[in-house]
């Protein structure tokens, strides 16, 4: 939100009680009817928020709910993002790991069924939890929705060649899901590296100063290798002005802070750790 600074990608709505009640009260329906009714229930839930007293919704929440209503009508949700200084990566629910192989994105962050307010979670969490609830009753229901956050790199750089690659990447996935007719888009032959959300690691600046970022985005870092230098100009004549920062584990650098000037505690880098091939 440009006024409040609130991240409205963390303002989506989820009512887990709706899932619990639905799983208890709709067991008599076949799979197709159950899925259709649940999709409508999700839309109605969002409508109830949008149609409530207008003074209860700020601008960010209203935008989020309107987007969510559109998304609940779909079977596939791709939330396209860019970051200040970032490599391409994909947020993928663990149940859809196989589908991640159809995007031409080398770095995949596998996320659990916990809801944390994001667009992709608002779409897959209800279906995932419904499937789990019905499984507890002895009924298997496939998860009807796939939702991903597709991080397309740095927002400060426009590269039309990369934009074409990104489009082909998305078309490859959509072709895999049989959205396209007579399409030839297929995934690139690349190695994809994955990391679980709990192993997605934020590295905070231990001191403030001017930063030279060394770890390349998308690059594999070995434990003990330099990731950045921090320069403290006021220490030039009295003590060591340059401090080299290292990481104590192997990692892949995914993004770093947008400025070369940081305070102590600034989120300097984010890394994949405990990496495995997908």
Model-predicted regions and their roles:
Residues 1-278:
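Structured catalytic-domain cores with a bias toward divalent-metal coordination
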